[in-house]
Amino acid sequence: MGLKARRAAGAAGGGGDGGGGGGGAANPAGGDAAAAGDEERKVGLAPGDVEQVTLALGAGADKDGTLLLEGGGRDEGQRRTPQGIGLLAKTPLSRPVKRNNAKYRRIQTLIYDALERPRGWALLYHALVFLIVLGCLILAVLTTFKEYETVSGDWLLLLETFAIFIFGAEFALRIWAAGCCCRYKGWRGRLKFARKPLCMLDIFVLIASVPVVAVGNQGNVLATSLRSLRFLQILRMLRMDRRGGTWKLLGSAICAHSKELITAWYIGFLTLILSSFLVYLVEKDVPEVDAQGEEMKEEFETYADALWWGLITLATIGYGDKTPKTWEGRLIAATFSLIGVSFFALPAGILGSGLALKVQEQHRQKHFEKRRKPAAELIQAAWRYYATNPNRIDLVATWRFYESVVSFPFFRKEQLEAASSQKLGLLDRVRLSNPRGSNTKGKLFTPLNVDAIEESPSKEPKPVGLNNKERFRTAFRMKAYAFWQSSEDAGTGDPMAEDRGYGNDFPIEDMIPTLKAAIRAVRILQFRLYKKKFKETLRPYDVKDVIEQYSAGHLDMLSRIKYLQTRIDMIFTPGPPSTPKHKKSQKGSAFTFPSQQSPRNEPYVARPSTSEIEDQSMMGKFVKVERQVQDMGKKLDFLVDMHMQHMERLQVQVTEYYPTKGTSSPAEAEKKEDNRYSDLKTIICNYSETGPPEPPYSFHQVTIDKVSPYGFFAHDPVNLPRGGPSSGKVQATPPSSATTYVERPTVLPILTLLDSRVSCHSQADLQGPYSDRISPRQRRSITRDSDTPLSLMSVNHEELERSPSGFSISQDRDDYVFGPNGGSSWMREKRYLAEGETDTDTDPFTPSGSMPLSSTGDGISDSVWTPSNKPI
């Protein structure tokens, strides 16, 4: 409805342009009424204002003309509507109805501060009131003298009359000015303020002073009795300290040292009672003798007399009306005086020191209170600096604040009256310059069209009534209206409104961002200024403040260090176990070998059992990582030992051969060596001495179908007899599916530690008539299974000896033996300890291979190893 009404108003204005002066009368009245009613709802104009707009604009009134006159009717419109158009926000700004009472409130606050919180010039008034009260008191004292009674009475009557008027007016002003406080607003708030103790004192003094002034200096009984009320003016001295600062200071000192005061008063009271009672017992039966020697009544006739004497004596007053007469009483009085006087005088010292400390604290507090205002200004400036960030489009409250503060005086009612008095033409004041038909989207306001002025009925050139400043204000107001219009129409605006405007050289789109940038710059400058002022107030008050700051910083540092140490202790120290070790369940735990027999457990490395809960502290994790690193070091040492063995180039000879058809002599084997078996490079060494063969049951035999056999046993498995080169012929055995053999140990001997008694046999003893059948692939298998050199990095023996774990492998191998069923097996191995090694550094404790079954008690020899399926 609003959009259609504005378009109808625009059409009506277009008709007025086309028809000149007479065309305005030809416009339909219904369109004008609709346009006027719509604009009245939009801009908040009163019906009288709408009539004034109609008379001023005629039938060609459009939206922009109404906007011009909205400035003139701004005050009346704001009084009649609770809402106004937001300047920088897209929503209407709610403005409550306010009276023009800023000056009234300012005066009220000023009077309240002068009477209740006097500072500066207000102290002069309170000093004058104090002199008036003091003068009344002095004159009241002089009236008691007969020689000054008449003169002082007359002056006292005049001064009291003046004081009554002063105090009455002051009390009325106090009641009225109390309305500036929220809790004292309204008549109920005023009654609450009047019930304050000091206000009640003022009322009582005023009521008591009025009868005294009324009766005057008459000599009747009533006037004489009422004159005694003049001394009630002493109570007016209490009103000098209306805020009670003195009493608050004394009360705070007493409360701060209440325990010391109670202790001193308690001990002093006990001393008073005890000394008075003892003196009464001694002096009660001693009569007083006058100068003539006559006996008088006793001085300490009652215990009350003794208490009076004790209080006057211990308070160091000493009237002398009562004194002990006997030496016993004097001795008691002297003893208790030395004790009691110190405790009676102690509260005075406590209060004096407490008051001094409180006064010093108040001075320091006043110095700190000076930081309150700069701190509040800094907080406010920091928030406005943050809220005016152009990227934060959701913060609109600060922009609304500037909308209420930054105001532009648009076309006021006085300006309209001045324009109407000059009898300027309608088109000269409000008609837009751009034609209706042009639908350009330009954002620049152009000056008023002179041609349109020439087309007016008067045909006389009129001066344009808008200067640059007014153009800027009009453009600013147009931008605010555009914001409001876009929010109301939900993004659908009047396309013709973009082409309308007053003469201005500034782009309309850049007007509001420019203003925001200026406000942003001002906020940055104010933030830096308030920050500088606040830093200036942070200067220490005196040397004690500096010492306190350093002490507070030191305590804070110690607390932080203690907290950090506690956190470190919590990290590195394991927590208490939830369940004792002797109560933990051992059910379901798998069998584990002892650490002395397991090849994967070192005896000197402490490891927790599987049943125990692992330590979850940082130190426990460090220990776990250290153990893993040690295991990795052992494995690396083992690999380095293997590398050293295989990189040594040895000249070994083959001691046996593998015949499959018949028998052949060693001479025939030598004859075929050069032409048939020269390319065979097998490394098989015998490190053991000759001896009786082991019984078959002492070997750990594994079936060949479960374990992959060696390359040269895969085709023709044979039995190699134990012995040297003269041990006889080799007898071939037929292959069997149940052939078993004993796998070699995974640990290889260190060749540099071989026994000097080892004998290497000739290579021809191992060669047979079918040795040429060995393929290169089988030859590689023989090389792998016969401990031939590996392609690893070369490490010398010195580096091996410097191994961090001292792990080395020093062992020999026995000769080949034959099993009962044709399988081959390794003989007993002899171990040798290298320099720097222990008995735990030998091959049973290497990190590869499984536990030998001999440790389980199965009757198998310790020299035999179980097959290892885990690669190194």
Curated annotation (Swiss-Prot):
The protein, known as: Potassium voltage-gated channel subfamily KQT member 3
Cytoplasmic side: 1-120, 176-193, 245-256, 354-872
Organism: Homo sapiens (Human)
Gene: KCNQ3
Outcome of substituting residue 310 to V: In BFNS2; about 50% reduction of wild-type heteromeric current; ratio of 1:1; or 20%; ratio of 1:1:2
Gene Ontology process terms (BP): action potential initiation; apoptosome assembly; cellular response to calcium ion; cellular response to xenobiotic stimulus; chemical synaptic transmission; endocytosis; excitatory chemical synaptic transmission; exocytosis
Keyword Nucleotidyltransferase among record annotations: no
Transmembrane segments: 121-143, 154-175, 194-213, 226-244, 257-282, 327-353
Subcellular location, record wording: Cell membrane
Composition skew (Gly residues), residue ranges: 11-25
Noted disease: Seizures, benign familial neonatal 2: A disorder characterized by clusters of seizures occurring in the first days of life. Most patients have spontaneous remission by 12 months of age and show normal psychomotor development. The disorder is distinguished from benign familial infantile seizures by an earlier age at onset. Defects in KCNQ3 may be involved in epileptic disorders. These are characterized by paroxysmal transient disturbances of the electrical activity of the brain that may be manifested as episodic impairment or loss of consciousness, abnormal motor phenomena, psychic or sensory disturbances, or perturbation of the autonomic nervous system.
